């Protein structure tokens, strides 16, 4: 096992490393978004090199980090991180609204996102929400709850990561894939038993059993499968 205690540089951000590795053989250490938030882990590269990551607690790996470099053999190990896409909601236009309307919209948006159990980070007049369901479903949630006046778009997680602090990155990406899917899209104008889009959660209780919840509005019916 090769112990990694320091990051040598980043090939995505540093022109010096870009030049060094231009004609080099690059072995990738592929991490998902949860693994990338850990300062300590053990994993093999695509070429089978056994690495033990032991970084300072405040240091997390980023896409493009160079972990090893052998100038003689012209071989480097570089981190590749697979991050989820992110929905970016632009709140800038709310600055032109009255204070009452701004407060009301922000409260309702927070309630809508929280009701879906979606993680979010607010920064630079924007809200970042990692995708845990299809973009069409997230689009439906925004429009059905009346937020179509707020510009929103879907971008790669790698575009957002450089804008975040380590703690914000952990909140946004750490374990987002384990968030229980819990999507309810139903217009306030619908009848109590009207049709709507209902995507329900599958919960695991750590005992080897899981069940899904099927909720209906009005009368509350639950269908449990063990």
Swiss-Prot record:
Its main location: cytoplasm. Keywords: Chaperone, Cytoplasm, Nickel, Nickel insertion. InterPro entries: UreE, UreE_N, UreE_N_sf. Residues 204-226 have a biased composition (Basic and acidic residues). Residues 192-226 are annotated as: Disordered. GO terms for cellular component: cytoplasm. GO terms for molecular function: nickel cation binding; unfolded protein binding. GO terms for biological process: protein folding. It comes from the Bacteria. Pfam families: UreE_N (PF02814). It is found in: Cytoplasm. Involved in urease metallocenter assembly. Binds nickel. Probably functions as a nickel donor during metallocenter assembly. Belongs to the UreE family. This is Urease accessory protein UreE. It comes from Yersinia intermedia. The gene is ureE.
